[in-house]
A protein has these predicted regions:
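Polybasic/polar functional segments that serve as interface/processing modules
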Residues: 1-104
């Protein structure tokens, strides 16, 4: 069984956009669709003193965002079984949140 896993930091996103949990839920669903994954259910969103996490568990992978809105920080974590391409999901999230991928 083959899979791909990508973790990317997005920059240039306004803190107001990152503070919208409904918007974060919507982009995780859109990212999963772009990768070709079907969700098990709705995204789970949890907020705490170190930011907000949105997690979408899917058949064949996951889409997770880790956000600290006050710092305009968004880390995207996508795992997909082949032939899914996590980069497609990251591109969808970057486009919808109006962020730029920070290459390592």
């Amino acid at each position: 069984m083959s899979y791909s896993h990508r973790v990317t930091q997005l920059t240039g996103i306004t803190s107001a956009r990152l503070a919208e949990t409904d918007g974060l839920s919507a982009v995780t669903i859109a990212a999963a669709a772009a990768v070709g994954m079907s969700p098990y259910g709705p995204p789970v969103v949890r907020s705490g003193p170190k930011g907000t996490v949105t997690c979408l568990l899917c058949h064949g992978g996951h889409v997770i965002t880790h956000v600290i809105a006050e710092q305009s920080l968004c880390i995207v974590d996508i795992l997909a079984l082949a032939p899914g391409d996590p980069e497609r999901g990251i591109d969808v999230i970057a486009k919808r949140l109006k962020g730029q991928k920070q290459e390592r």
